[in-house]
């Protein structure tokens, strides 16, 4: 067998008849499959053992030779070679066709490749192939032209007139003759000549023909091979036939299709031998052609061949296509051994890196390991008895199992795996029961909850796999989210509530103002009921083991609460003592105002102080981020476990309950509603008098009700007791938000109808009072729409992720520095006056392109190619610098990937990115994963002339597919001053712009809102009206970089509006893939074809060679491709074929004789090679291990050291 890791590239081409015969082990002559009585394959049939190999290992068909000792013997009685039955998966056969047939892929595709080569229309071809018309193959000395079509009558007339003076034929034979006569050299030269003068349609056609001709010429494929003389038969194990219970047989559709071909082929042979009339032979040939068409691609032409129950049969093409096809079902996603799945339950007492594995599941997963160990320990004599022991569940196997799984990580995966945190490694601990135990903190990353979710377990087998799982995938290593570098393991729900309750402060609580000598004394007093968790007390600061206190502070008293003392015990000693939820306290030190002299009257001091807010979810997140920055992974994961345990413990002690009595109603609600009703009445009167339009009335009514709801909400918040359990839950960020509470205790407010329009009748009741029937009915609209939207959004978002992954899967960090001298100038992204993404966030973790100096002091803040840390970014912004040039993926020169410097920091680890990191896939996941959170709906902007501005998921798709946006803005093609804005007829406006050497006017429809006024200075490509710019128009007016900047800003706007943060670099990687191609306009002296779509790198290299040899380089214009188009235009045909339009991609690749260099990830997964990313990248695979020096024998026991 072929060693999969040892080949460089894969090539695809057309097969010549001789090639097909050379693959074959014999000709299939009969349509029979197996004998139903003996269940043995029929000889020369579709399952023949002589052709395809024996059914049983080392046994011939007649049984004369049995056993492995006859290996390689060919039986003299039945002609079957004695070998393994596995050969039935790889041996092919063939069918010698009695008449040539055309291959439907090349004749039917769009554009028809056969049509282009022969310069005939697909309609004409169809008439010839399916025996409706004759075609002249040799005109001889007649007035007929070659390739002219003749009807039956015309043919007869010319035959009588000229006799044998010309030859014409029909069917694939005639096509084959014409194809064989084509002189590719001559045709290409003629086409190149024609191109010099041709225009319009003729030029396009010539370019397309030239492309196909060149493809045939360069690949060495012969055009006549598009017509088949021999048909290959695929190995029988790939189209199996199995016996069902009850003696019936189930068979692959391919066998039916092959049977039809063989039957018709044999019948045609017989008719030809008998010398049957022409019309009968022609009909049989047409039927053979149709049978072969159905075998190759059933349903492509005419009605598909159907099996029982009118179901179309699955042909060879269908075997490859779609989600259930060979590519996506078996090559890119396989079922694997050493895996299992079960329901998950919470494991609150696990460590961050552990998971609980049910005993019986662990036993099954680690069976071979346990068997080996049983034999190794002498508990079983051989593997067989070890296996028997395991099956009987003998008591001694459990100790062995524990030993085996110790330090052997397993992978846990929850579907849908939207980003790389959907698969993480854990160390298993054995648990009773049949459910997997999962650590509560990793739930956010998996998006898991315990309402019946299931998870899959996989066992990494090899030492390398275990090492990678432990070092890279262990849950304790994956604390940061790759999309924005923020911690993803923040506590939630009970943990948040517990820590919130712990850090609450209460006035006049039991024991307020008591002074304690140390933490232990305070805890003792708390346990005995002398003080409360929330009591504000004083503790001698010197007794607190915090390294941040100054010597002065150690002599003083620290004002804090018992709860905060306990909370601070979970933090590292050198972390500031956290007494208030402020940035200063977290990052620098405990504010000095909390330290008082020992002589102070503590009670009076405390009584005079304001209460401090407790620690909410966001603060806990900030604490984790801060601990991570200062102490790195190990300490952070330990601290997280302590925070989790403390949270659960205290929330249990707090004993939060929710009852209907906790929902207090608002006294003033009635007055507010009365007032709103009056206002609405007034508005309606104004409308009746004709003072306002219906639209204005609607807008105002909605405004009134929204204001009323907000007022009720505001009053509710004020009237609430801070210790109200519902308030605590939502204030801490554990569950729910203020709008939920308003609906419970205030009013539900306005609802939307199915079209998304707001119904102007508000729901004035709340859930505490109960809704009227009408109110309940109105509210069902919104509820139902919410559910359907969610279901649709999930599918859309998943498909978006798939396309993103496909377009960027080969973007890998390939080198340390690409040495580019270009960069991207960035400033804060704004929408109007609102800052969407501040400069600081855009700078952090990037490399500077130029030296950055302070504008006033001229002191160097960062040198060229320095990494901009958070501190430097803050310095830059504080210095008042508004734009900075940084290294960016947009300007990276690395071929097939990005370099370290242009990419910047790896957000998932907070350190420099490694060579081999698959940043393309990470980018695709980071953009696709939050897709489900984006809303589906297109918002109606207020105002009479409100255009629909697409937002949310549809807008993201619009950007990445480079479609013409809805609500398109008009852009200017010249830069200059707006000299006039005049109103034309139909209330249109005309804007005139005076450039330096050009003057342009634009007509603006009256519904559009202007962004400019007279006297404004505009740049080329700037939008004159509100709306989205069409990036394809922008690329015509401006350069590539400004299009890239625009797309980046637009994507960020959509995500940030929804409160989702994504690192710029991910969007940069994706956008760069959309602008990789260039359309050649003028070929110069190069041998590139005009109109070709080329990779920018290939184009530049071709031009460099041309300039070096002193000839004229080609010119081209950059093209913006949507992600689907860009994935299909990739150089790798394997990757493109496994994405979409499989047959088209393969047809094209076969004609061009394409080579797939296996640079991306998908191609290698399809072939079963190691992916060229991470430790599989070339530079790591080629490392050889060498012994540096032998170490001396270690005699000390480890415990003694």
Swiss-Prot record:
What EC number(s) is this enzyme filed under?
2.7.7.6
What does the record give under GO molecular function?
DNA binding; DNA-directed RNA polymerase activity; magnesium ion binding; zinc ion binding
Give the reaction(s) catalysed: RNA(n) + a ribonucleoside 5'-triphosphate = RNA(n+1) + diphosphate
Q: Which residues are noted in the entry as Mg(2+)-binding?
A: 449, 451, 453
Q: Name one Pfam family in it.
A: RNA_pol_Rpb1_2
Tell me the residue numbers annotated for binding Zn(2+) 1: 60, 62, 75, 78
Biological process annotations from GO: DNA-templated transcription
Record carries keyword Transferase: yes
The note describing how and how many cofactors are bound reads: Binds 1 Mg(2+) ion per subunit. Binds 2 Zn(2+) ions per subunit.
From the UniProt record, list the coiled-coil ranges: none
Required cofactor names: Mg(2+); Zn(2+)
How this chain assembles, per its entry, is:
The RNAP catalytic core consists of 2 alpha, 1 beta, 1 beta' and 1 omega subunit. When a sigma factor is associated with the core the holoenzyme is formed, which can initiate transcription.
The function of this protein is: DNA-dependent RNA polymerase catalyzes the transcription of DNA into RNA using the four ribonucleoside triphosphates as substrates.
The entry assigns this protein to a family as follows: Belongs to the RNA polymerase beta' chain family.
HAMAP family named among the record's database cross-references: RNApol_bact_RpoC
What's this protein's name? Answer: DNA-directed RNA polymerase subunit beta'
